[in-house]
A protein has these predicted regions:
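Amphipathic alpha-helical assembly/interaction segments
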Residues: 1-112
Length: 112
């Protein structure tokens, strides 16, 4: 197992991707751009966490973690839009926000 795979923040980010994937393809016609934006932002989180762990300098690591954090914030906003448009239910919205809250909190500490 690689270092980043042992991180709780990475596992939470992977759980968030797993939460998103089932309903992305099921979004009604006309919402493809929103689905694509969420897909890219959600997948960016664990990918940037892995990339940060491969960085050698602490400033480089912090910058890459900050990018992952920005993607997590973007996902939270997209989840709010999806809920407002009634494209996801309250349970999925709540679970997504719980995971993203944990991810953002951990990434904020890693950015320091």
């Amino acid at each position: 197992m690689l270092t980043f795979q042992r991180l709780d923040v990475y596992r939470c980010a992977i759980d968030f991707v797993a939460l998103c994937v089932p309903f992305l393809d099921g979004l009604p016609r006309g919402h493809a751009a929103l689905a694509d934006q969420l897909r890219r932002a959600a997948m960016s989180i664990p990918l940037n966490i892995a990339q940060a762990e491969g960085r050698t300098g602490s400033a480089d690591k912090a910058r890459t973690y900050a990018i992952a954090r920005g993607s997590a914030m973007e996902c939270a906003a997209i989840f709010d839009v999806l809920r407002t448009l009634a494209l996801i239910d309250d349970a999925a919205h709540r679970r997504g926000n719980e995971l993203l809250d944990r991810v953002v909190s951990m990434l904020t500490r890693l950015c320091r």
